[in-house]
Design a protein with these regions (language model features):
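Conserved C-terminal helix/tail region of periplasmic/extracytoplasmic solute-binding proteins
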Residues: 315-352
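N-terminal secretory signal peptides that target proteins for export/translocation
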Residues: 1-8
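Bacterial N-terminal signal peptides
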Residues: 11-23
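Short, glycine-/small- and polar/acidic-enriched structural segments
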Residues: 34-190, 194-201, 220-222, 227
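Pocket-lining segment of extracytoplasmic ligand-binding domains
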Residues: 177, 183-187, 192-282
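Bacterial signal peptide processing site
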Residues: 25-27
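Boundary at the C-terminal end of the N-terminal hydrophobic targeting segment
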Residues: 29-32
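Secondary-structure end/capping motifs
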Residues: 243-327
Length: 352
């Protein structure tokens, strides 16, 4: 009976010797095995279907930047920021792109996981009211007495009270018409409402594609009227961040590289996006990317301070604006929501 362990030990020893000899005789195979073992798998969720603003992620994948950081990244889509945050909290995914303002509200729950953002992609939130000039709307104050279509899942409307108050608009005189996101642009193009709430780079481009003349569109960007909110940001599962901080840092570095590549080669970036879409239209996505880079990503603040970070003073003002529609149990500090330790130094975050 005692011979069995001895036999097993000798068998394992022989196997180990054989593998050692094989590795020594084929160093390339051993190196490849070691390299594969060092790679970290990441499950990443976007909070909505693929569109042009996601180009930096796909460029990082296409150009091998994630691989250079020893990461294997898989992409999927959630049904909105709340769904993506729930997936992160459960540990179903490791990182996600979500609306940072929804993260702020999520973190105020009594049972909320301590999820934090590690990279802000949209330095300015894309919230906007997109209106028809032919309906007499040219500025924010012209919305009084008008009807604005709002999708059920729309997050921009949560900051409308602060925006209206800041600009002297009587919010009680603006009518809101609830609708499905799928019919938001068709209803405006058909003239059933005077304006719609949404994202500037999505709704405006979609409406032009539906035949609404560009000079008939008034794109009233919240940021142009004093909204301090940041926009989409990369968030990470707390356990993943604690156990694999180098992987998170590597992801951020690769994303910055992908963003720089997107800025330099927007047409190639759009080709990569469209290749991942079921029914993407290249010209529309190129227009979308051009808009989002100019309006939301490459802002003056980003050109001064670099990609991915936040200004704590501005962030606090943004939280104050959220508080006009949302009652916090405890108002958060910037450090409760954003973790800057995963960002490279500023020199590595400047637009090349």
């Amino acid at each position: 009976m005692r011979a069995c362990p001895t036999f097993l030990s000798r068998g394992l020893l022989a196997l180990w010797i054989g593998l050692t000899v094989l590795a020594c005789s084929h160093p390339g195979a051993a190196s490849a095995a070691d390299d594969a073992a060092r790679h970290v798998a990441i499950q990443f969720s976007f909070d909505r279907p693929i569109e042009a603003s996601m180009a930096p992620f796909f460029m990082a994948a296409k150009d091998g930047l994630f691989g250079a950081e020893h990461l294997v990244v898989s992409f999927n889509s959630a049904a909105g920021s709340p769904d993506a945050l729930a997936r992160i909290a459960r540990g179903d995914i490791d990182l996600a792109l979500v609306d940072i303002n929804e993260l702020i509200r999520f973190r105020d729950r009594t049972d909320a996981a301590p999820i934090k953002a590690v990279f802000v992609l949209f330095n300015r939130a894309p919230y906007a009211i997109v209106a028809r000039r032919s309906r007499g709307i040219h500025t924010l104050s012209d919305l009084e007495g008008k009807t604005v279509g709002v999708a059920d899942s729309d997050l921009s409307i949560r900051l409308w009270p602060a925006l209206a108050h800041q600009n002297g608009v009587n919010a009680a005189h603006v009518r809101f018409y609830k609708m499905s996101a799928a019919v938001r642009e068709p209803i405006l193009s058909a003239g059933q409402v005077d304006a719609v709430a949404g994202f500037s780079y999505l709704s405006a481009v979609n409406l032009r594609d539906r035949g609404v003349p560009a000079d008939d569109l008034a794109v009233l960007r919240y940021a142009d009227y004093g909204c301090e909110a940041y926009g989409f940001a990369v968030v990470v599962n707390p356990s993943f961040a604690a156990s694999k901080p180098d992987a998170v840092k590597g992801f951020v570095r690769a994303l910055i590289g992908g963003l720089n590549a997107t800025v330099k080669e927007p047409e190639r970036a759009v080709d990569e996006v469209v290749s991942r879409m079921e029914d993407g239209v290249r010209d529309l996505e190129l227009a979308r990317l051009s808009t989002v880079l100019a309006d939301n990503i490459l802002t003056d603040e980003v050109r001064r301070n670099g990609l991915g970070g936040v200004d704590p003073v501005r962030f606090d003002r943004a939280i104050a604006q959220i508080a006009q529609d949302f009652k916090f149990r405890r108002r958060p500090a910037t450090s409760d929501i954003f973790d800057e330790q995963f960002l490279p130094p500023m020199a590595g975050r400047l637009i090349n």
